[in-house]
């Protein structure tokens, strides 16, 4: 959600920001709708005040047994006008509906561009494996080991699902425990276990609704399955007013995530790269305005640390204006090397949403300035650290051996009964 006062005071700047995000000029319409809303509400308050005065007059006249038919008729006329104006309050709805579909303003650091081709590489880490044989895909490796079953998953649930067995199921669990241990023990995040069904208001709070309604699964009674733990963790501070001394708040969770993958027809149709259901470890930070810039750098480094410990080659990209997520003001994508595709693929996305989500959730913090309490909107950040399914893909492909077995990364072996290799049983 946007600050209307900012739009009124900076219409050209706002239009430029929206154009950089592939939207047209919109500031004038927002200002006009806001003025209409203000005028309508002024009329409404004036009529309500007038009716209250007449009502008091009628009560007094009746008490004194004085005829008051004229006042009663006038009260009825005013009531009709009030009802008419209440019906016109759709102007307010139109303004909110418009603001609800406008993305966040890009940070000044964000490069201007149309799509992923205009993203900028920030840094790389790790050396790519020099295979002495043609590397297999993760799904070839998994199926050959009889540990990855797409056919049985399709019988149960259709396409874009997978069943992991034995050592791969253990690897999935090991990765979750490893990531959570790093985040909580080394970086001070608090682990949260939360529902995966949330009210639509929670989805609205982080910007998933209304614009991306088709991307999530709706159940009954206005519940939605979460596409990411970001939804649950960020909404823990909705309608809160936190003492600034309690910030930053850093939370982490591992949960199942559910995505309809609307618009992804034909993309990554084989394997685990793009699934309707997957596990992911998420990071969320709730901070002050002054803390948010450095917090994004810290969060990104935390996500990178997982890949460093797993010894997986990766690169960090800064997304351009045209590729930013809806709620993000600035985003770093971390892309891991996938040998079979001979390219880097996204495994984490770390974003600073600044006050955009906080306005939708009414999440604030307070400080004392010159003896007075000052309320401000918190800044929210979120990051994948990491998507577990894609981490499994990266491990299978980067740690594969010529015989089709998989060497288990050293940091995971204590989570897998000290096994050092995954092989066909």
Curated annotation (Swiss-Prot):
Known EC number? 6.1.1.11
Source domain of life is: Bacteria
Signal peptide position in this chain?
Answer: none
One GO CC term on file: cytoplasm
Q: What is known of its domains?
A: Consists of two distinct domains, a catalytic core and a N-terminal extension that is involved in tRNA binding.
Q: Which PROSITE patterns match?
A: AA_TRNA_LIGASE_II (PS50862)
> What is the protein's known function?
Catalyzes the attachment of serine to tRNA(Ser). Is also able to aminoacylate tRNA(Sec) with serine, to form the misacylated tRNA L-seryl-tRNA(Sec), which will be further converted into selenocysteinyl-tRNA(Sec).
Q: Which GO terms describe its biological process?
A: selenocysteine biosynthetic process; seryl-tRNA aminoacylation
Name the family the entry cites: Belongs to the class-II aminoacyl-tRNA synthetase family. Type-1 seryl-tRNA synthetase subfamily.
Q: Which gene encodes it?
A: serS
Pathway membership of this protein?
Answer: Aminoacyl-tRNA biosynthesis; selenocysteinyl-tRNA(Sec) biosynthesis; L-seryl-tRNA(Sec) from L-serine and tRNA(Sec): step 1/1
What subunit structure does UniProt give? Answer: Homodimer. The tRNA molecule binds across the dimer.
> Which Gene3D superfamilies did the record assign?
Bira Bifunctional Protein, Domain 2 (3.30.930.10), Serine-tRNA synthetase, tRNA binding domain (1.10.287.40)
Which residues hold L-serine? 228-230, 282, 384
Catalysed reactions, semicolon-separated: tRNA(Ser) + L-serine + ATP = L-seryl-tRNA(Ser) + AMP + diphosphate + H(+); tRNA(Sec) + L-serine + ATP = L-seryl-tRNA(Sec) + AMP + diphosphate + H(+)
Residues annotated to bind ATP:
259-261, 346-349
Location in the cell = Cytoplasm
> Would you tell me the protein name for this molecule?
Serine--tRNA ligase
Q: List the disulfide bonds.
A: none
Q: Which GO terms describe its molecular function?
A: ATP binding; serine-tRNA ligase activity
Q: Fetch the Pfam families from UniProt.
A: Seryl_tRNA_N, tRNA-synt_2b
Q: Which UniProt keywords apply?
A: Aminoacyl-tRNA synthetase, ATP-binding, Cytoplasm, Ligase, Nucleotide-binding, Protein biosynthesis
Q: Does the keyword Acetylation apply?
A: no
């Amino acid at each position: 959600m946007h600050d209307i006062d900012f739009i009124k005071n900076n219409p050209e700047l706002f239009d430029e920001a929206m154009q950089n995000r592939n939207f047209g000029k919109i500031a004038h319409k927002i200002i006009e709708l806001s003025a209409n809303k203000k005028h309508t509400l002024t009329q409404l308050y004036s009529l309500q005040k007038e009716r209250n005065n007449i009502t008091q007059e009628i009560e007094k006249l009746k008490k004194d047994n004085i005829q008051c038919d004229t006042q009663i008729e006038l009260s009825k006329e005013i009531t009709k006008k009030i009802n008419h104006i209440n019906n016109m309050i759709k102007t307010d709805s139109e303004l909110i509906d418009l603001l609800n579909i406008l993305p966040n303003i890009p940070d000044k650091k964000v490069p201007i561009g149309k799509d992923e081709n205009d993203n900028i590489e920030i840094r790389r880490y790790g050396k790519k494996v020099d295979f002495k044989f043609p590397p297999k895909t993760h799904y070839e490796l998994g199926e050959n080991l009889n540990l990855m079953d797409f056919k049985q998953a399709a019988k149960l649930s259709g396409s874009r699902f997978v069943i992991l067995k034995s050592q791969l199921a253990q690897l999935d669990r090991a990765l979750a425990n490893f990531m959570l241990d790093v985040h909580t023990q080394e970086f001070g995040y608090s682990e949260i276990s939360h529902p995966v069904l949330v009210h639509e208001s929670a989805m609205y709070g982080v910007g998933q609704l209304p614009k991306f309604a088709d991307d999530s699964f709706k159940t009954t009674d206005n519940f939605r399955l979460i596409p990411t733990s970001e939804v649950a963790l960020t909404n823990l501070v909705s309608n809160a007013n936190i003492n600034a001394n309690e910030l930053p708040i850093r939370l982490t969770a591992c949960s199942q995530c559910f995505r309809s993958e609307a618009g992804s027809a034909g993309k990554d149709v084989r394997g685990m790269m793009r699934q309707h259901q997957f596990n992911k470890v998420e990071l969320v930070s709730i901070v002050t305005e002054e803390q948010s810039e450095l917090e994004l750098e810290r969060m990104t480094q935390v996500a990178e640390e997982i890949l460093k410990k797993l010894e997986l080659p990766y690169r960090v990209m800064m997304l351009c204006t045209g590729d930013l997520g809806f709620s993000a003001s600035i985003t770093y994508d971390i892309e891991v090397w996938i040998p079979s595709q001979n390219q880097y693929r996204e495994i984490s996305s770390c974003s600073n949403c600044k006050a955009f989500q906080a306005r939708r959730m009414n999440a604030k913090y307070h400080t004392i300035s010159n003896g007075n309490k000052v309320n401000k909107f918190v800044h929210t950040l979120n990051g994948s650290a990491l998507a577990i399914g894609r981490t499994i893909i990266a491990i299978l492909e980067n740690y594969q051996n010529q015989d089709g077995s998989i060497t288990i990364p050293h940091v995971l072996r204590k989570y897998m009964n000290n096994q050092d290799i995954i092989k066909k049983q």
